[in-house]
UniProtKB/Swiss-Prot annotation:
Name of the protein: Replication origin-binding protein
Organism ancestry: Viruses, Duplodnaviria, Heunggongvirae, Peploviricota, Herviviricetes
Keyword Repeat: no
Source organism of this protein record: Bovine herpesvirus 1.1 (strain Cooper) (BoHV-1)
Endpoints of the signal sequence: none
Binding site for ATP: 83-90
């Protein structure tokens, strides 16, 4: 692709750029090479000085961070600290609290982001001989009130449990890991969002003294505090000190996983894949283990942590695995008793291992829509403060990155930008994509009224979640975060990447990733299952779940086990709930006419608890938190789409469980009609809010340069038909595919059949053949018999040769309770009992009316 800067700019200036077209502050969101660094505070000093001249900005360098004395005559009310991990922030906080509490009998509220961090900080407060602090773990009653809680550590999700009068009397508010604490507002576990948002906002506005610290403090936070407290009350400390354990660490990105090395070792083969020249992830790990070194391994997924453990156990029995399926292990001192430590993001802020004991660290990072974001990965990598050989080897598994062309990488590597720059043919496109994303984020969650903090940081949250669709974007974000902690980052041939116009990590990765992913799946299938399907239905939690969600008569044991195993993952839980809500709205037509009825259905299915079956075979429960996820208007559009597809309906004459869970023979024009015109239902906005998917608008994708650059950054090489944009029909098919796959767990695949519909052509009835002929505009005059019409249809077979698609719901879709009911709702097919009870609480005035009375046919 060749173009001059001006031509490239003209080629891509289309819809979506309005959010950044005014220049100034908004233009910063259009810089694809510096956007990640800006969101994590790399430009904090410059932006604060320019936007808030009255804010005191203090730079510290070459030594651990130090907080300004709380007793100084010129001490400001609000102190904000930005300093890397391992720079001594918590130690400085303890000194500051010791000084403040030594002079006055002040009350203190410490708000944390994680339970583990609360426990660790409580221990450090106790070890520092500070006045006793209570924690919300110790509370004997749900509401914490009285003098016993004047000095309290509480997780942000439990802030509503603090007595409101007590909450207004705290003298000092401490927010260690403040950006992570604010990020919890978007967590699916945040059950009382409006209440917590209001309480935290009030604390920030009224608490006499505030200390907020984080390694990634950005200008958004300072803007908020300056607006609430006045710029003259804010003191910002920016410290660039990093301990030797980070400063000397070097991160190398492995180009290959070495799945064959893993497989060969697990099978006991003598020749275990040494042909990769020692460059792969598992070859390097094997070399360390053979040398008798101590290693730690981070994994984004539980499954890979278990596979890595099996690999390491072939070298040494001294392996400790910490993931969500294993018993919790909060004693970091025990880590020195093992040769191999393997952990997931269960080990994050609050736990730190300071000993120089492990020789090297290995990290398996898999960006995926429901996986940990890159900030969580960065924080987990920072738990090991020192390495003997200062070696960090990272492998990026891009197999879960979205392949659809509507998912476009939008970030350029900042090192390449600083070392000669990216070609304008790249930067003009990616800057536009950043603007398009900014424009999409602006109206997001507008239905969330009464929230003060949630809207302020929604862009950063959506940025962190949406970029997980791209391995390239995720790599660039992690690179910026590690550089923020002064970790050396080595990526083969990175500095010459702009000459090839492709990120080295991506080159060839699209070709290799299916094979590597298949190898891992095959190995995972070999992990024995300790659980039996028998008896699951008798478990109390499973029985209650079945009464609420599943069809009468129960589900077959094997199908129930498969469902409960799937529900152990947050992605499957979300999709299960979404499909239940959709089915409920399909079978209660009033939901399409009344927001209150819709809300009743949504609250019924999206709240409470569901049982899950862990990999260890234990039945546990996972809480559902109805949040700001569904736009009713979008749901109504999806309901219309499902009705048109005939999904979740009983097939005529079938058995009770013969449910339509698939639609076949879908043509591109039919899909375009289902998705609707751009001015209709905004499914792209729906996907952004529900599934955290950033769909590039059709007008942007119609431009050839955008498609070509996205293909290069995604590792697909040059796009087919270079210079040609994505057509409207192809864009609609991609959106349709993402809707059903990401929101409901369905699968859309190309079909091999020639004619539309699910029936085989030789089984078509006469009226069905007539309908097909008329659809194609074929003259059937003089043909009356079935045979004549069939021959006529087959003679025009070429007219039906356009691409066809099949959509199939997940297998557990037919287990849902409403699925076995009649094809049309009515008195003979009422909602299942628990939903009917929930809807009984909806006042009659909110139900649809007919001639001034309740329309009983719609109930």
């Amino acid at each position: 692709m060749t173009a001059t800067p001006g031509a490239a700019a003209d080629a891509v200036r289309v819809e979506g750029a309005g959010a950044c077209s005014d220049g100034g502050e908004e233009a910063r969101y259009a810089s694809s090479a510096s956007l990640a660094r800006m969101l994590y505070g790399a430009d904090l000093s410059e932006r604060v000085r320019r936007r808030h001249p009255a804010v005191c900005v203090e730079h510290q360098s070459g030594r651990p961070v130090a907080l300004p004395s709380p007793l100084a005559a010129d001490a400001r009310r609000v102190t904000v600290v930005r300093a890397p991990m391992g720079s001594g922030k918590t130690t400085a906080l303890l000194r500051w609290l010791g000084e403040a509490l030594g002079a006055t009998d002040a009350s203190v509220l410490v708000v944390s982001c994680r339970r583990s961090f609360t426990r660790t900080l409580h221990e450090r407060l106790r070890d520092a001989a500070l006045p006793a602090f209570a924690t919300y773990f110790d509370a004997r009653s749900y509401v914490m009130t009285g003098a016993a809680y004047r000095r309290l550590l509480v997780q942000v999700e439990s802030l509503h449990r603090v007595d409101e009068e007590l909450l207004g009397d705290y003298d000092i508010l401490v927010l260690d890991e403040v950006m992570s604490t604010l990020a919890q507002l978007y967590s699916p576990t945040m059950g009382r969002l409006h209440r917590v948002d209001a309480l935290l906002h009030r604390l920030l506005r009224r608490c006499p003294r505030i200390v907020a610290m984080d390694a990634t403090v950005n200008a958004q936070l300072v803007d908020l505090l300056a607006a609430l407290r006045g710029a003259g009350s804010v003191h910002v400390v920016i410290c660039d000190y990093a301990s030797a354990g980070f400063l000397q660490r070097r991160c190398t990105v492995a180009r290959r996983l070495g799945a064959r090395v893993l497989a060969a070792r697990l099978k006991g083969d003598a020749e275990d894949g040494a042909e990769d020249g020692g460059a792969s992830f598992f070859t390097r790990l094997r070399a360390r283990l053979e040398a008798g070194h101590n290693v730690c391994v981070f994994s984004s997924t539980v499954l890979f942590s278990e596979l890595a453990a099996r690999f390491c156990l072939t070298f040494t029995p001294s392996v400790l695995v910490l993931n969500s399926t294993r018993p919790a292990e909060g004693d970091v001192s025990r880590w020195r008793d093992v040769r191999v430590l393997i952990y997931t993001t269960v080990i994050t802020v609050g736990l730190s291992f300071d000993h120089s004991y492990f020789h090297a660290m290995f990290a398996y990072v898999k960006p995926m829509s429901h996986g940990p974001d890159m900030v969580s990965v960065y924080q987990s990598l920072g738990r090991i403060r020192s390495l003997v050989d200062n070696e960090l080897c990272v492998y990026f598994d891009s197999s879960a990155a979205r392949p659809e062309p509507v998912f476009t990488p939008m970030l350029l590597n900042h090192v390449v930008a600083e070392d000669g720059g990216w070609p304008a043919t790249f930067s003009e496109v990616t800057n536009l994509l950043c603007c398009s994303f900014r424009a999409a984020c602006a109206p997001a969650f507008r239905g969330a009224r009464g929230l003060a903090l949630f809207p302020r940081f929604k862009y950063k949250h959506l940025f962190e979640r949406c970029t997980l669709a791209s391995a390239s974007d995720s790599l660039n974000i992690l690179h910026a975060l590690l550089e923020n902690n002064r970790v050396g980052f080595q990526l083969e041939a990175l500095r010459s990447a702009h000459r090839r116009g492709i990120l080295p990590l991506s080159r060839g990765r699209a070709r290799r990733r299916p094979a590597a992913a298949a190898d891992l799946r095959a190995l995972a299938a070999g992990i024995p299952s300790p659980v039996s399907a028998e008896g699951l239905a008798e478990h109390p939690a499973v029985a209650a779940f079945a009464d609420k969600y599943l069809r009468a008569g129960g589900a077959p044991p094997a199908a129930l086990e498969e469902l409960l195993r799937a529900l152990n993952g947050p992605a499957a839980r979300a999709r299960f709930v979404n499909l239940a809500v959709l089915g409920g709205c399909l079978h209660v037509p009033a939901a399409a006419e009344s927001l209150e009825v819709f809300a009743g259905i949504y609250r019924h299915y999206a709240s409470g608890e569901v049982p899950v079956l862990t990999e260890a075979g234990a039945v546990e429960t996972a809480a559902l938190a109805p949040g700001l996820r569904w736009k009713p208007t979008a749901l109504f559009g999806l309901r219309r789409m499902a009705r048109a597809l005939g999904l979740l309906r009983r097939r005529g004459g079938g058995e009770a469980d013969d449910v339509a869970d698939a639609a076949h023979g879908l043509t591109e024009p039919a899909i375009v009609e289902l998705v609707g015109p751009p001015g209709g239902h905004d499914y792209a906005q729906c996907l952004l809010e529900i599934a955290r998917c950033n769909i590039t608008p059709a007008g942007v994708m119609a431009r050839g340069p955008v498609v070509a650059v996205a293909a290069r950054l995604s590792g697909r090489g040059f796009a087919q038909g270079r210079g040609v944009g994505l057509g409207a029909a192809a864009h609609a098919v991609s959106v349709f595919k993402v809707i059903w796959e990401e929101v409901f767990g369905a699968r859309l695949q190309k079909s091999t059949q020639t004619f539309p519909g699910h029936a085989r052509v030789k089984n078509l009835r006469k009226h069905e053949i007539v309908a097909l002929l008329d659809l194609a505009g074929i003259d059937r005059a003089g043909r009356d018999t079935h045979r004549e019409l069939y021959r006529l249809l087959m003679s025009h077979k070429a007219r039906f040769a356009s691409p066809k698609y099949s959509l199939r719901l997940p297998k557990w879709g037919r287990l849902l309770g409403f699925a076995a009911r009649g094809p049309e709702p009515g008195p003979d097919a009422p909602p299942e009992a628990s939903l009917e009870a929930a809807l009984a609480r909806v006042p009659a005035l909110h139900w649809p009316c007919a001639a001034g009375a309740v329309d009983f046919c719609a109930l």
